[in-house]
Amino acid sequence: MLTFCRQVSTLAKSKVIKTARPAAAKVIGDVLRHRRSLNGILRTALLSLPENERGLCQQLCYGVIRWHPQLQSIADQLLSKPLKNKDSDLQALLLCGLYQLRAMRLPEHAALSETVNGCAALGKPWAKGLINASLRNYQRNQSSIDNKALDNDVATYAHPDWLIKQIKQDWPETWQQILEANNVQPPMFLRVNQQQQSRQEYLTRLIQNNLPASNVDLSPEALLLDTPCDVYLLPDFLTGAVSVQDAAAQQVAAILQIKPQQRILDACAAPGGKTCHILETEPSNEVIALDIDPERLTQIKQNTDRLGLHATLKTADAGDIDSWWDGKKFDRILIDAPCTGSGVIRRHPDIKILRRPSDVDSLVKKQQQLLEKLWPLLNTNGLLVYTTCSLLKQENELQIMDFLTKHAEAEELLLTSAPATRRVAGYQRLPGENTLDGFYYACLRHC
């Protein structure tokens, strides 16, 4: 009998989940417990769900991860003792319930009952009483529980303490607005492939397909959708008419000042948005795109194929010159450097969970190595554009200031059309400015 019971329990745990709430709980639990990236595991989870459950699952995953420090602080008020590590999925299910009650326009009784039913789908029906009691307690006493739970910056702004302190230090006048912008659901920007049609022509097609949008002044190829949609609803997406890319990232191609007959290096290229934009600007140029991750390099290939473009793709660490360089110098080098991603938290809220304070120093060191290794590969009068999607000064203006003091043959090129706010070195856009992502740009000329 004991063996039979164990077999039944194993089957319950291993069966495929077909509803949004327990599916979201498993994804969130994996992010919290195993520090796995949200995008990858969510993509896999959605494939196993019926189409009518996918939207809610995605909304729960992003919402709970975005507000995790706040929701966790509330959950701590509801539980007499923490759940065990092996029950991270139950912890996540409770957070899903709280998120529905706090932020989603769902009937409360349905949100509560369906969340409680998720315990059985997770193979843990014994937890129904615990989840039910916790959520009902919150329903009854929300105001007093919130007052206790939200009495500190970590819970109020839903960011880890170390990151709040760093942003306060770097941006003492605007740190609160930055944190608030990080918690806003991001808009959806498009980049029109002008090798196929003009921006105005594509805008007309969007409107004809009941997808209202508007031009973005900061980039000549950029459109902003009124409401985000599935990419496969975009006219001729599969045949390369358009790509999804934040307008802040779209400004990079203009800063490179691309001309015909140039040899261009995109040193940290995946997933390929900037590589493709460079080629759309001048398809005949020789573009070498590197990435250390072969799976991510495959993403670049998929994007260039969809857009009908060609780049030379190499799996390599850009800093390991001997492993990939053929000895010919470049006219343009783009270092879209690995960084904390602190400027794009609104798009990747799991950054709050996955990043650690120690990451900053290691990333700054890697950025410095890339600058030092790749700079000698640039032709005289060539341009090196250094970008990050970070807002931390160590990774941005301080990094470039340090580089310029060490290299007399390097000068910063002041841009006639500033892509963002001028800093001591480079240009910084903070998250949410003009509804764009946080981004840093510096353009260096080899004298």
Language model features: what each stretch is:
Residues 2-447:
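S-adenosylmethionine
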